[in-house]
Amino acid sequence: MKRDKVQTLHGEIHIPGDKSISHRSVMFGALAAGTTTVKNFLPGADCLSTIDCFRKMGVHIEQSSSDVVIHGKGIDALKEPESLLDVGNSGTTIRLMLGILAGRPFYSAVAGDESIAKRPMKRVTEPLKKMGAKIDGRAGGEFTPLSVSGASLKGIDYVSPVASAQIKSAVLLAGLQAEGTTTVTEPHKSRDHTERMLSAFGVKLSEDQTSVSIAGGQKLTAADIFVPGDISSAAFFLAAGAMVPNSRIVLKNVGLNPTRTGIIDVLQNMGAKLEIKPSADSGAEPYGDLIIETSSLKAVEIGGDIIPRLIDEIPIIALLATQAEGTTVIKDAAELKVKETNRIDTVVSELRKLGAEIEPTADGMKVYGKQTLKGGAAVSSHGDHRIGMMLGIASCITEEPIEIEHTDAIHVSYPTFFEHLNKLSKKS
């Protein structure tokens, strides 16, 4: 796809529903007794994989674009799937689902695409095995395809080596089916969508700063869920609005969960002109409107406990840093290496092609600003949706047009991304 520089970005857009919350609304609705309705669901490829997997386990789910109705009959009504549970490109689907499957009294086989086959699963299968789960796969359960044979589980106290909502959620979902109490402790608090939504479905949890406990045997009751716009998707337009001259963008109903708003902190620290208008009628998940305007930006240092709050936004933050005065340092972000691609490598390689001065480090990168990005190059998403969108925004500010390969990866989380970008830049 060929993209060229834009003069200005103006207008208002509704960011598609949050991917993390959309996945969980389907999963928990499938485990609950009663009818769960979901509004503003993200109909991206990843979340559709979650629907498909639960349909294979006998759950009746109706989906029409961003409206979903799940007719749940409780966790005990899940049936043994007759075919492979295919998660596509979705790490969230496979890791959370492993926690559910671990305690079900049936056999299941789980796999995904080439990218999933490279992603580490032992970080989830290991604690589940400690609870009594029977999980096998390539390299002793490190890689897909994985097989799960139902087992009776016992609660554990698990200290996770990394702050990962996927690990935490998988262990809590297994804990829901285990004998006794299960506790997960993390080095920093990771995103808490699972805890918020389990509470909305009637499950009691006890939480402190970095740990959460769940008692086994609790049942979920159907709930109505509104999914706010995904702040990880909004981040691309927040960056674009700050960088492109004479711009003003209004982003409606964006999720403002404090475990996800690291990008807002970074923009404010860089000196961006950002206005936040919280909504009064937020339910379990806070949301509001964000208004961004062209800003003069300064470099920042990013590391420590903010990293889990913006791990998915680092590609677009790196681009933003090319337009900030000074050297931006991103550290403590080794987790980037096990995303859809090794995002330290892909961010550095693609931005260098556009003329950026950027260096990889062992756990992040250094970006030197302020720079003019020349462009005039062919770049690739490497099959990673967030790299593809970063390059889409980069094309707005490069001197010469760029050719972006493999843009179809963007459908995973933001199918209307280029449509929205064209609307803001007044391109048809």
Swiss-Prot record:
SUPFAM superfamilies, sorted: EPT/RTPC-like
Disulfide bridge map: none
EC number: 2.5.1.19
Cellular component annotations (GO), alphabetically ordered: cytoplasm
Active-site residues, as the UniProt record annotates them: D312 (proton acceptor)
Residues annotated to bind phosphoenolpyruvate: K19, G91, R119, Q166, R343, R386
Family matches, as CDD domains: EPSP_synthase
Keyword terms, alphabetized: Amino-acid biosynthesis, Aromatic amino acid biosynthesis, Cytoplasm, Transferase
Keyword Nucleus on entry: no
Matches recorded under NCBIfam families: aroA
Quaternary structure and partners: Monomer.
Protein name in UniProt: 3-phosphoshikimate 1-carboxyvinyltransferase
Organism: Bacillus subtilis (strain 168)
Gene name tied to this protein: aroA
